[in-house]
């Protein structure tokens, strides 16, 4: 993708997450984008993301659902604002309040994983995202993230701590 991802717009104070932080050199650094009304992210598991030979371990899959969901929540909230500048992207941050994952089939290693999400509910500071992971076009995982917007008081506390 040529446009910036949702995560590219996170303020640096919120860009350290292992799953989606652009400033975490050891993390996954996932990149999520809009594809119509759905969000999409691609991730290629490394050989060390193994569960049993040939298959991805469930913790990685949960992490992908988690971080793609919070990124989608931030982008969905931003998209819903009437005063948004169409040439900008979200810089708000959301955190996981609830994560539910259903493992439907073993997910193979060595193939590009496609993570997709869709906004199920957007109300106040809460966004519910339904998601699924595809391997070779087959849904292997379904999940749901309930994400809440980071309170301004937490942002202020983090900024103070950096000074």
Task: Please name every model-derived segment.
Residues 40-76:
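A conserved, well-ordered hydrophobic junction motif at loop->secondary-structure transitions
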Residues 29-31, 102, 116-118:
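Short, surface-exposed charged micro-motifs
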Residues 72-114:
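Hydrophobic beta-strand-centered segment that forms part of the acyl-chain substrate-binding groove
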């Amino acid at each position: 993708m040529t446009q910036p991802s949702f995560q590219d717009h996170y303020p640096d104070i919120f860009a350290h997450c292992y799953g989606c932080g652009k400033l975490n050199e050891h993390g996954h650094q996932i990149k999520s984008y809009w594809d119509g009304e759905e969000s999409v992210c691609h991730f290629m598991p490394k050989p060390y993301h193994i569960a049993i030979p040939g298959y991805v371990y469930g913790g990685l899959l949960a992490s992908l659902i988690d971080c793609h969901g919070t990124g989608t929540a931030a982008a969905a909230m931003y998209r819903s604002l009437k005063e948004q500048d169409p040439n900008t992207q979200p810089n708000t941050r959301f955190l996981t309040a609830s994560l539910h994952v259903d493992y439907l089939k073993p997910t193979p290693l060595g193939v590009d994983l496609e993570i997709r999400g869709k906004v199920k509910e957007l109300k106040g500071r809460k966004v519910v995202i339904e998601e699924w992971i595809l391997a070779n076009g087959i849904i292997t995982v379904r999940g749901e993230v309930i994400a809440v917007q980071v309170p301004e008081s937490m942002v202020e506390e983090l900024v103070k701590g950096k000074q």
